[in-house]
Amino acid sequence: YLHRRHEAGDEILFEGAQGTHIDIDHGNYPFVTSSNPTAGAASVGSGLGVTTVGDGEVVGIVKAYLSRVGEGPLPTELDGDADEEALADDIREKGGEFGTVTGRPRRIGWLDLPMLRHAARVSGFTGVAVNHVDVLAGLDDLKVCTGYQLDGEEIDTVPTTTERWERCEPVFETLDTWESFDSAAVAEGGYDALPEAAREYLEFVADEIDTPIYAVGVGPDREETVELTNPFDE
């Protein structure tokens, strides 16, 4: 069926779940799932050849901060003191960061660009959609991890072993914060309706990972999305 649709010239969308860093081959083993949540699984799972699937767009989905379920390295985790834990609680509540089935609170951290660079490289992102930008509104401080310190050396992507990753210390860049905004109004007004500091945040991320922003989630509803590039457009 998929081969016929492709040969007829139809567009086909494959949607993955979970995340790069719990990929059984490319994640931080043994803190992984049993499958491949990376883009290569689209070919294996669908039966379409890699040259067919690889000829299209690959849009990475990322939150404006970091969350994780379960164990494993998380260098930017907000758990160092009472203030960090309070901030993590605030982000967790605003972002609904609880397990869908178990209700277990997810671990929260600042956006980790080394992790995002690794994800972009492994899956070959042509663009990213950044969600939960509204959740970071109203913070007193805003940080992004741009690299790690490991054994006296600064690196810009995740190391090759989990043991080395566990020893990494984050290198942070502090960015301007933005005030809360009306999600529906921003979705209607488009990208320029976002607060200036939010746009600067997104552009900083895009520059750091050398990947353009395709869409921005500014609220919890599907309609509260700002589209910059539609991969289905010719």
Task: Kindly give the residue locations of the regions a language model identified.
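Non-transmembrane, aqueous-exposed alpha-helical and coiled segments at domain scale
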Residues: 1-234
